[in-house]
């Protein structure tokens, strides 16, 4: 059993060590996510530190926004794609996250073992979270066969470790922070901008 678990975890991790596992189209998702922040929370001429988790070889937030419009982007991933990439394993039991204005999880939380715990850590070190998630359509609950087939495909083909509906995501994110804005990308991924409640406290 221990050998199987080791193999399984290495298989899911090793996929992201190679550039051909990433799609350059994900930059469009990054643009739409950042537009959520710019449209709802951005203050003109402000300076914002951004941490891009799971940046991949294309690092869309870093390449699109670093050094522009007051954004300074740091990129993090399982592997150091270049000297600017910080290595991090978000599933580590000893996870420590950097303090920043915006933490980005674009195409990332599907692979996390303990989403609530990690996002609670993230909101404690961030003013905002930008999150994308490939959700499970609620309509699938009306057909158990299709539902199970979908979950099986998510688990085996994609290696995803959690399977949430938008209803669950809204509840989860509302317990972590304040949902500032929501959008949809590509018809099957929800985009969330979450604000740290501390920003609403007046001294």
Please place each PLM-identified region on the residue numbering.
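Short, well-ordered alpha-helix to beta-strand connector turns
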Residues: 47, 100, 125-127
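Core SAM-dependent methyltransferase catalytic element
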Residues: 181-203
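A short SAM/SAH-binding and catalytic strip from SAM-dependent methyltransferases
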Residues: 101-114
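Conserved beta-strand signature within the Rossmann-like core of class I S-adenosyl-L-methionine
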Residues: 126-138
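Conserved N-terminal segment of class I S-adenosyl-L-methionine
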Residues: 1-94, 98, 190, 201-203
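Class I (Rossmann-like) S-adenosyl-L-methionine-dependent methyltransferase catalytic domain
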Residues: 45-46, 144-162
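Short alpha-helix
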Residues: 155-177
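A short, conserved alpha-helix within the catalytic core of class I
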Residues: 112-125
């Amino acid at each position: 059993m221990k050998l199987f678990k080791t193999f399984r975890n290495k298989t899911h991790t090793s996929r992201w060590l190679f550039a051909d596992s990433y799609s350059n189209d994900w930059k469009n998702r990054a643009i739409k996510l950042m537009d959520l922040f710019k449209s709802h929370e951005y203050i003109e001429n402000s300076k914002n530190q951004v941490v891009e988790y799971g940046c991949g070889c294309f690092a869309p937030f870093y390449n699109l926004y670093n050094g522009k419009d007051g954004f300074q982007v740091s990129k993090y991933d399982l592997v150091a794609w270049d000297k600017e990439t910080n290595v991090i394993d978000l599933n580590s039991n000893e996870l420590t996250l950097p303090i920043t204005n915006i933490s980005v999880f674009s195409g990332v939380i599907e692979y996390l073992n303990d989403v609530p715990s990690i996002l609670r850590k993230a909101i404690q070190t961030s003013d905002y979270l930008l999150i994308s998630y490939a959700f499970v359509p609620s309509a699938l609950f009306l057909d158990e066969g299709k539902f199970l087939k979908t979950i099986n495909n998510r688990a085996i083909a994609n290696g995803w470790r959690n399977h949430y509906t938008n209803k669950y995501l809204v509840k989860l994110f509302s317990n972590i922070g304040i949902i500032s804005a929501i959008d949809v990308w590509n018809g099957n991924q929800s985009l969330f901008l979450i604000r740290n409640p501390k920003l609403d406290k007046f001294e």
